[in-house]
Amino acid sequence: MKRIQSRDNPFFKGLKRLAESGRERRKTGQTLLDGVHLVEAYEAAHGAVDTLIVGESALASGEISRFIEGREVLVLADNLLRDLGLVDTPSGLLAVAAMPQAAAAVDLDKDAILLDGIQDPGNVGAILRTAAAAGVGQALLGPGCAAAWSPKVLRA
């Protein structure tokens, strides 16, 4: 397992840019996922994530240690994990994942939800989660909406 201890590490700097910048996420086509359950859901729908990152203290967590068993992971110092600022209390597991491309066309035979101008990532995430729970299979985000693959939307 490779360990990252320094804020000057180029990989950490890239993580920080992904965490803070929508422009960086669009440029790289990647986002950050926080937590075992979100990573599991992503992998079930889209395949393996690009990189798994675990906080030093999270190596002792039963759930996380079982999840990473046999997988290549990077170990990030706990203070660096907190520095990313994705959540107040990090879960201990992050993943760098490719953002799936949106479907080119709307399937008119399926339910859809249209969001327009909803800027708050927490609100976008809550609406998308509620719509998914109600069986809505498509979401269209209009101009001015928070990005669907923003870490804050995914966490909501």
Model feature map: region roles:
Residues 1-61, 145-146, 151:
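Boundary-proximal intrinsically disordered activation/regulatory segments immediately upstream
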Residues 22-23, 65-66, 84-87, 103-107:
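Short secondary-structure boundary/capping segments
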Residues 30, 50-52, 72-74, 92-95, ...:
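Structural motif
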Residues 35, 95, 154:
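A residue-level signal for conserved active-site and pocket-lining positions in enzyme catalytic cores
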Residues 36, 56, 76-78, 97-99, ...:
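Fold-independent oxyanion-binding glycine-rich loops
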Residues 36, 93, 126:
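Gly/Ser/Thr-rich helix-start
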Residues 44, 100-101, 105-156:
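RNA substrate-binding interface of SAM-dependent RNA methyltransferases
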Residues 62, 68-98:
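Glycine/small-residue-rich loop that forms an oxyanion/phosphate-binding "nest" at active or ligand-binding sites
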